[in-house]
UniProtKB/Swiss-Prot annotation:
Protein name from the UniProt record: S-adenosylmethionine:tRNA ribosyltransferase-isomerase
Organism: Salmonella typhimurium (strain LT2 / SGSC1412 / ATCC 700720)
Keyword set, alphabetical order: Cytoplasm, Queuosine biosynthesis, S-adenosyl-L-methionine, Transferase
Subcellular localization: Cytoplasm
Any one GO molecular-function label of the UniProt entry: S-adenosylmethionine:tRNA ribosyltransferase-isomerase activity
PANTHER family referenced in this protein's UniProt entry, alphabetically: S-ADENOSYLMETHIONINE:TRNA RIBOSYLTRANSFERASE-ISOMERASE
């Protein structure tokens, strides 16, 4: 399959640069996987689409202020984007500079250049940086870091993004991008879903900066997926197995929840799904056999991205591309701060190719 098979025309005007004033008032395009039928509505329509006993699986990662500005002690400007926190003193990061720093390079970080750090090692495209500061890394990032808005949101981050670019249930700091399908859930909607009898469970996948990297090969089978840390604890496994046993659906909120659950299913030795704690490089594209999820809530993704490939593997290629064409025609808002889709599984998708 070719990467260009997953391309579509998107006017710049449809890229959302700010979220809706009210989280749950975004538009919702529902795609019936088996038939391809499309329905237009709003996000709160989920109350009608979900049944008592259905299980929603959320990603409770929390976005860290992962973008740092500063300079090398020798003078050159740098931009640091944290990929992951290694411990209380060290980070693994992408560094943008006119000349890549060498191990031992001293860095002065923060808008006032008050934080001292040292680049200690290089691991491929990533740099290991150690802070010379008594505070834990997370405290330093909260003090001097900027929210890492995606590259297609063409504006500086604002104070409001510290909350707007978080899900209301975010709990575990470590992501450099929000699991954006979850941004549409507010407390009233969550309460109404609970009242209806919808079950909820929480995985953790710390979204890395690699999620924004373009696919740089022509043939998608040649793509090497970036690695991200995921946790699927025992209580999630129990909730999934219980939902399946009673004939209810497992509904992933976002592609990161999909990748967490399917990673846990791939690693399972005896049951449908077993607890999973570790890095995952799972790459889901047409031909993949889904094992766990029955429905998916997700935003609209970039052309030629691994995420539109994941959706195509779930709903079927033709149904997915037709839904995106319709979304453009109907002027849905795209990407992280944009509108959402509710998709049910298409069992025929596994045998469909572009």
């Amino acid at each position: 399959m070719r990467v260009t098979d997953f391309s579509f025309e998107l006017p710049e005007s449809l890229i959302a640069h700010y979220p809706q004033p009210e989280r749950s008032r975004c538009r919702l395009l529902s795609l019936e996987g088996p038939t391809g039928a499309l329905t237009h509505g709003t996000f709160t329509d989920l109350l009608d689409k979900l049944n008592p006993g259905d299980l929603l699986v959320f990603n409770n990662t929390r976005v860290i202020p992962a973008r740092l500005f500063g300079r090398k002690a020798s003078g050159g400007k740098i931009e640091v984007l944290v990929e992951r926190m290694l411990d209380d003193k060290r980070i693994l990061a992408h560094i943008r500079a006119s000349k890549a720093p060498k191990p031992g390079t001293e860095l002065l970080l923060g808008d006032d250049e008050s934080i001292h750090a040292t680049m200690t090692a290089r691991h491929g495209a990533l740099f290991e940086v150690e802070f010379n500061d008594p505070r834990p890394v997370l405290d330093i990032l909260n003090a001097i870091g900027h929210m890492p808005l995606p590259p297609y949101i063409d504006r500086p981050d604002e104070d409001a993004d510290r909350e707007l670019y978080q899900t209301v249930y975010s709990e575990k700091p470590g992501a450099v991008a929000a699991p954006t399908a979850g941004l549409h859930f507010d407390e009233p909607l969550l309460a109404a879903l609970r009242e209806k009898g919808v079950e909820m469970a929480f995985v953790t996948l710390h979204v890395g900066a690699g999620t924004f990297q373009p696919v740089r090969v022509d043939t998608i089978e040649d793509h090497i997926m970036h690695s991200e840390y995921a946790e699927v604890p025992q209580e999630v496994v129990d909730a999934v197995l219980a939902a399946k046993a009673r004939g209810n659906r497992v509904i992933a909120v976002g592609t990161t929840s999909v990748r967490s659950l399917e990673s846990a299913a791939q690693a399972a030795k005896s049951d449908l799904i077993e607890p999973f704690f570790g890095d995952t490089q799972i790459f889901i594209y047409p031909g993949y056999q889904y094992k766990v999820i029955d429905a998916l809530i997700t935003n609209f993704h970039l052309p030629e991205s691994t995420l539109i490939m994941l959706v195509s593997a779930f709903a079927g290629y033709q149904h997915t591309m037709n839904a995106y064409k319709t979304a453009v025609e109907q002027k849905y808002r795209f990407f992280s701060y944009g509108d959402a889709m509710f998709i049910t599984y298409n069992p025929q998708a596994i045998s469909e190719r572009p």
